[in-house]
């Protein structure tokens, strides 16, 4: 039997909620779980206990240290090992964020709160509570039968930026992107940027935590970070966001961060996951669908054009206090059985058909670009 060695944990009469993270990285799952854990204590006055998969080779030590600085944080080899700590810490619930399919991340001894982030068939419902991450998922795939808990959107307060540090002139247009390492994977979008900087000298692209796809002094790649102040400096540096992820977003935290600062989102038209579009007014984003359309958008971009701040931006509703009241409502009340009707199954099926339409449109152009257009451009 495994010997469990843990640091002192203050005895408390507060309700203890455990949070499980399979990969400690710079991406949305880890970032959002940190904020839920933080405000579970600050707003809901509960106790947060962190578990993570210590066997995951992709863990970032700096992220683990960030959690350990704030919470009692314990590494385990698998999800079921958390049950060893049930009585020691009087765990009431275990929260886990995942794709949404039935798997081994569910406990028979601890009430498991499943927060899912990808479209799923309704037959995948499991756990003590099953909650989706966005109104797009809830409406398009569950007919609003599954409760919704959005991410918390929180930005550090500063007016400073990175232009001086990165040696970017004040009059330069700066278009930025941040997210997971593979979040800018559209080859034709990459090629468009490379072509544009050769022809247009007053534009610079800055990528945070994105895999490097070229070498040019005005296409800058910054290492990923868990430092929220640095992220805000990066956001302040940019005049707009360039989005180039083929899959799209089931919530779109990075898009929300840019939009919350009233910056235009330049997005791909044929993403399968389209929550980032659902949250915003059409005046807050512009979509490209080809190399030519993206080139024209970027070439004609005017940094002095201001967005109307009164236009729809539902990301602004994702403030800590408001989100944690939803967390309490959907996760911490008595279990309520979700009744699924034939209409709900039809809506779910229709959602997948629509998503596949976007996928087919995406594949058609990208194959055309790969085998024909890229050869002559």
Per-region residue spans from a language model:
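Conserved donor-binding/catalytic core segment of Leloir-type glycosyltransferases
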Residues: 18, 157, 168-184
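N-terminal strand-loop element at the rim of the active site
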Residues: 21-27, 34-82, 211
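A charged, aromatic-enriched C-terminal amphipathic alpha-helix characteristic of glycosyltransferases
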Residues: 28, 292, 302-357
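Nucleotide-activated donor-binding/catalytic signature segment of Leloir-type glycosyltransferases, i.e.
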Residues: 71, 207-229, 237
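Acidic donor-binding loop of glycosyltransferase active sites
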Residues: 91-93, 233-250, 263
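Donor nucleotide-sugar binding/catalytic pocket of nucleotide-sugar-dependent glycosyltransferases
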Residues: 128-158
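Short alpha-helical segment that forms part of, or immediately flanks, the ligand-binding pocket
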Residues: 232, 255-260, 274
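Short hydrophobic beta-strand element within catalytic cores of glycosyltransferases
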Residues: 264-269
